[in-house]
Amino acid sequence: MMLKPSIDTLLDKVPSKYSLVILQAKRAHELEAGATPTQAFKSVKSTLQALEEIESGNVVIHPDPAAKRAAVRARIEAERLAREEEERKIKEQIAKEKEEEGEKI
């Protein structure tokens, strides 16, 4: 029985079979958690879907893990700052409305 995608095809995409297993497991967990798929799948199982994405080249190992972690931290920080700015604007709007309401009375 021939499995698709084949291990030979997949090993052309990643440096070692150990890296392949880790990448597949991480991507399968992401898909299970609701991550957006990068393509239409033939397979139903998330583990096989992850292999399909790896085979097509849509999912790769980041060449510099430290840079990836830094990018993730920067994105999280930017999201936090955006939320804080939005909260500040809402509080300012509420204060302005209360002030206008006080002038009307």
UniProtKB/Swiss-Prot annotation:
Keywords: DNA-directed RNA polymerase, Nucleotidyltransferase, Transcription, Transferase. The keyword Calcium does not apply. It comes from the Bacteria. The keyword Lipoprotein does not apply. One of its GO terms (biological process) is DNA-templated transcription. Gene3D superfamilies: 3.90.940.10. Its EC number is 2.7.7.6. InterPro entries: DNA-dir_RNA_pol_omega (IPR003716), Pol_omega/Rpo6/RPB6 (IPR006110), RPB6/omega-like_sf (IPR036161). It holds the Pfam family RNA_pol_Rpb6. It catalyses: RNA(n) + a ribonucleoside 5'-triphosphate = RNA(n+1) + diphosphate. GO terms for cellular component: DNA-directed RNA polymerase complex. Transmembrane segments: none annotated. GO terms for molecular function: DNA binding; DNA-directed RNA polymerase activity. Belongs to the RNA polymerase subunit omega family. Promotes RNA polymerase assembly. Latches the N- and C-terminal regions of the beta' subunit thereby facilitating its interaction with the beta and alpha subunits. The RNAP catalytic core consists of 2 alpha, 1 beta, 1 beta' and 1 omega subunit. When a sigma factor is associated with the core the holoenzyme is formed, which can initiate transcription. HAMAP family: RNApol_bact_RpoZ. This is DNA-directed RNA polymerase subunit omega. It comes from Streptococcus equi subsp. zooepidemicus (strain MGCS10565). The gene is rpoZ.
